[in-house]
Amino acid sequence: MVLSAADKTNVKGIFAKIAGHAEEYGAEALDRMFTTYPQTKTYFPHFDVSHGSAQIKGHGKKVAAALVEAANHIDDIAGTLSKLSDLHAQKLRVDPVNFKLLGQCFLVVVAIHHPAALTPEVHASLDKFLCAVGTVLTAKYR
């Protein structure tokens, strides 16, 4: 998915607003995903997936860091997330659909916290960005 100049501006703008809360939002998105799509818990058998657990917060921090890095290097998402793509494809073998589910949950969290900032245009740009991240993370699956 190709991000236009306007999309890139919108994504950078929304990430500037959420930057101070990225870890919190990452954990909220994971919590929402585990609640809404309980089948996603199968990839975390060693986690306490209860609301607010330290493990959800810790993994949410990793998710947020990856998204922030991708937004900061929006012109090279593939290069930025290459190692993470290798990890998910070759070692963790996460079902690719889960990236889409997590992206949807992240969008909801952003909408909850920044409803005025998530205009239809920004929503579309953020959705395209999250789809691009998901595509990169699944590119090395065979």
UniProtKB/Swiss-Prot annotation:
<keyword id="KW-0479">Metal-binding</keyword>
<dbReference type="InterPro" id="IPR012292">
    <property type="entry name" value="Globin/Proto"/>
</dbReference>
<keyword id="KW-0561">Oxygen transport</keyword>
<dbReference type="GO" id="GO:0031838">
    <property type="term" value="C:haptoglobin-hemoglobin complex"/>
</dbReference>
<comment type="function">
    <text>Involved in oxygen transport from the lung to the various peripheral tissues.</text>
</comment>
<dbReference type="InterPro" id="IPR000971">
    <property type="entry name" value="Globin"/>
</dbReference>
<feature type="domain" description="Globin">
    <location>
        <begin position="2"/>
        <end position="142"/>
    </location>
</feature>
<dbReference type="InterPro" id="IPR002339">
    <property type="entry name" value="Hemoglobin_pi"/>
</dbReference>
<dbReference type="GO" id="GO:0005506">
    <property type="term" value="F:iron ion binding"/>
</dbReference>
<dbReference type="GO" id="GO:0019825">
    <property type="term" value="F:oxygen binding"/>
</dbReference>
<dbReference type="GO" id="GO:0031720">
    <property type="term" value="F:haptoglobin binding"/>
</dbReference>
<keyword id="KW-0813">Transport</keyword>
<comment type="similarity">
    <text>Belongs to the globin family.</text>
</comment>
<feature type="binding site" description="proximal binding residue">
    <location>
        <position position="88"/>
    </location>
    <ligand>
        <name>heme b</name>
    </ligand>
</feature>
<dbReference type="InterPro" id="IPR002338">
    <property type="entry name" value="Hemoglobin_a-typ"/>
</dbReference>
<dbReference type="GO" id="GO:0072562">
    <property type="term" value="C:blood microparticle"/>
</dbReference>
<keyword id="KW-0408">Iron</keyword>
<dbReference type="GO" id="GO:0043177">
    <property type="term" value="F:organic acid binding"/>
</dbReference>
<dbReference type="InterPro" id="IPR050056">
    <property type="entry name" value="Hemoglobin_oxygen_transport"/>
</dbReference>
<dbReference type="GO" id="GO:0020037">
    <property type="term" value="F:heme binding"/>
</dbReference>
<feature type="binding site">
    <location>
        <position position="59"/>
    </location>
    <ligand>
        <name>O2</name>
    </ligand>
</feature>
<protein>
    <recommendedName>
        <fullName>Hemoglobin subunit alpha-A</fullName>
    </recommendedName>
</protein>
<dbReference type="GO" id="GO:0042744">
    <property type="term" value="P:hydrogen peroxide catabolic process"/>
</dbReference>
<dbReference type="GO" id="GO:0005344">
    <property type="term" value="F:oxygen carrier activity"/>
</dbReference>
<comment type="subunit">
    <text>Heterotetramer of two alpha chains and two beta chains.</text>
</comment>
<dbReference type="GO" id="GO:0004601">
    <property type="term" value="F:peroxidase activity"/>
</dbReference>
<keyword id="KW-0349">Heme</keyword>
<dbReference type="InterPro" id="IPR009050">
    <property type="entry name" value="Globin-like_sf"/>
</dbReference>
<dbReference type="Pfam" id="PF00042">
    <property type="entry name" value="Globin"/>
</dbReference>
<dbReference type="GO" id="GO:0005833">
    <property type="term" value="C:hemoglobin complex"/>
</dbReference>
